[in-house]
Design a protein with these regions (language model features):
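C-terminal capping alpha-helices of c-type cytochrome domains
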Residues: 74-104, 158, 163-209, 520
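The canonical Cys-X-X-Cys-His
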Residues: 34-45, 85, 122-134
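Gly/Gly-Pro-rich "capping" loops immediately C-terminal to redox-active cysteine motifs
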Residues: 30, 42-72, 131-158, 265
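Immunoglobulin-like IPT/TIG beta-sandwich domains and homologous Ig-like subdomains
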Residues: 340-402, 463-466, 476-477, 483-486, ...
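Central antiparallel beta-sheet cores of small beta-barrel/beta-sandwich binding domains
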Residues: 211, 215-299, 304-315
Length: 562
């Protein structure tokens, strides 16, 4: 006889599902959402749906929820219906700009060390499985935070042993707060904190909801950005509205990598959620497809964010867009670091630049002489600059075309040290069953500055320098041999990890994971050798992730991430 067992997930502070008498909660008036979700999410007499009406999230957050419903609960929705649901919920139950800004790193897919300024014990509870970015880009009622905690425990039972039981923060730095009068249970503390700090109803969302309107983005924009491993980029982007809606656009861009001179042309589509969140793709379906996440400022004259690709979203530039109008815009000068006593050809990038045949209107400050103007276009100006032999060390602002660019150039007398960034990197083995996760390193040159002392506040950051790259063993145990198995680094500083899975050539049939030093070596004009290094952890793939960018289903004979 087969017994029937009932598993109940209990969470401290969990009350009955949303109190029908509460004033909180949003009516769901979108027929596709109601039709697709009402099988499990009940609708009350105010058109509020259980769970759904009591939270607000980013487009990525809503898309992850829809994907989870499809994957785990066999919700039958077409891709078009799923997109429609995400669009509706993101617009009607999204985040205000002020609410999202602290969590932009999450939606921009940045691998950073984030320091949560709130309760460190709650942070410790949450970051055992995901970043705090996942948390701070949501708003919920206190009951809904408790239900989310129960959902975690039901779907991922191991969290009880990882963080949800006992005082998980004991002994951790920053977790010494006075707990008198509080529950010592991590879940109680998290629910109370999150319900107070990230509630459903906020003044910011009330104000933005009343002010939200269709974005007016059509026109020409100048691009300035920076891609690790490639350097600064400059160009233009054209946005056009489509007939499919007031929040849908097409884009076409042309930009140049200033360091290499490589010119790139892209075309794509974008949607704007919640009135200010650009989500797009350029060159879709190709090997060089980029996903686009940008934050549109309130004046709709500027937007910024990240364009990225890669299995772990690890490749791509940071970008800033400024709308081109009648007034000239100067976005950058390359090269930026100019040595005393030398003449250098530089390119000034921007938009609506005036036709200039002499240097009388160009002002780079004291100690900088304007030479021959070799090219003058509306988006770039090529000119010869000579730095006086006795020019003062430091940054110079650029004044021209009734426009200003702060720290346009850096006057220096040589490179005194280099630094490898990031100081700590992470790559993921892959290529057999899971995709590889790459890590890009750069060497940044520094000058000691006016005081000629290393590591002081007046040091001058000179930008990327051309170095030779190599790996060294990060010795953690006797006979450590990680360097022989983890992977390799190329001349551009891009680390490629080895295959995932068991390696029979390695002692103990271990995986190709481990720690190494990434070493950069630079030879100065004077023949001195400068060296710097960074730590690299080569770890396992992400075996399970509800990734909103990827389809549900196998592809390319590789297992899903998610």
């Amino acid at each position: 006889m087969v017994g029937l067992s009932i598993f109940v997930v209990w969470t401290p502070a969990l009350q009955s599902q949303q109190d029908p008498q509460t004033a909180e909660g949003y009516a769901i008036t979108h027929s596709t959402t109601v039709q697709a979700c009402s099988r499990c999410h009940t609708v009350d007499d105010q058109d509020r749906m259980s769970r759904i009406s009591y939270l607000r999230k980013t487009p990525e957050g809503w898309q992850t929820s829809v994907r989870r419903m499809v994957a785990l609960h066999d919700v039958n929705v077409s891709p078009e219906q799923a997109r429609d649901i995400v669009r509706y919920l993101s617009n009607e139950q999204g985040l205000a700009p002020e609410e999202l800004r602290p969590g932009l790193f999450e939606v921009e897919r940045r691998l950073i060390e984030h320091d949560y300024e709130g309760d460190s014990a709650v942070e410790f509870t949450c970051i055992q499985c995901h970043s705090m970015g996942r948390v701070i880009t949501q708003r919920r009622t206190q009951d809904e935070w408790a239900l989310l905690m129960a959902t975690h425990r039901g779907l991922y039972p191991l969290v009880d042993r990882q963080a949800f039981r006992g005082n998980a923060c004991t002994g951790q730095p920053g977790c010494e707060e006075n707990l008198e009068g509080q529950s010592n249970h991590p879940m109680d503390r998290a629910i109370n904190h999150l319900g107070e700090v990230f509630p459903l109803l906020t003044p910011e969302w009330s104000a933005w909801s009343a002010n939200k309107r269709p974005p007016q983005l059509e026109g020409e924009w100048v691009i300035s950005g920076y891609e690790p491993g490639e350097g600064p980029i400059y160009g233009t982007l054209t946005i056009k509205a489509t007939e499919s809606g007031t929040d849908a656009f097409t884009s076409s861009s042309r930009y140049v990598y200033a360091e290499s001179g490589l010119t790139v042309e892209r075309s794509g589509q974008g949607l704007v959620y919640t009135g200010y969140q650009w989500r797009g793709r350029s060159n879709p379906g190709t090997a060089d497809e980029l996903r686009e996440v940008m934050f549109i400022e309130r004046d709709q004259q500027r937007m910024s964010g990240r364009w990225f690709s890669g299995a772990y979203d690890e490749i791509g530039p940071d970008v800033t867009l400024q709308r081109i109008g009648a007034a000239p815009i100067v976005t950058g000068v390359y090269p930026q670091a100019l040595r005393r006593g030398e003449t250098t050809e530089v390119t000034i990038y921007g938009g609506s630049l005036s036709d200039t045949r002499d240097g009388a209107g160009l002002d780079f400050g004291p100690g900088v002489s304007i030479g021959m103007i070799e090219q003058s276009e509306t988006d770039e100006l090529v000119v010869q600059l000579t730095i006086d032999a006795d020019a003062a060390l430091g940054a110079r602002d650029f004044f021209a075309f009734e426009s200003t660019l702060e720290d346009a150039i850096i006057v220096h007398d040589g490179i005194d040290r280099i630094v490898v960034t990031p100081e700590s990197g992470m790559a993921r083995v892959g290529g057999a069953n899971f995709p590889k996760g790459y890590q890009t390193f750069e060497a940044i040159g520094y000058n000691n500055g006016p005081d000629n002392e290393n590591g002081t506040d007046d040091d001058l950051k000179l930008g990327r320098v051309n170095v030779s790259w190599s790996l060294e063993e990060y010795t953690a145990t006797f006979g450590d041999d990680d360097i022989d198995f983890v992977g390799s680094i190329n001349s551009k500083g891009i680390f490629t990890p080895a295959l995932d899975g068991v390696n029979t050539d390695r002692t103990g049939d271990r995986n190709n994971i481990g720690d190494v030093w990434v070493l950069a070596t630079y030879l100065t004009q004077e023949g001195r050798e400068l060296r710097a290094r960074a730590h690299l952890l080569v770890t396992v793939p992400l075996y399970m992730r509800f990734e909103p960018w990827r389809p549900i289903g196998p592809a390319n004979n590789q297992r899903l991430i998610g």
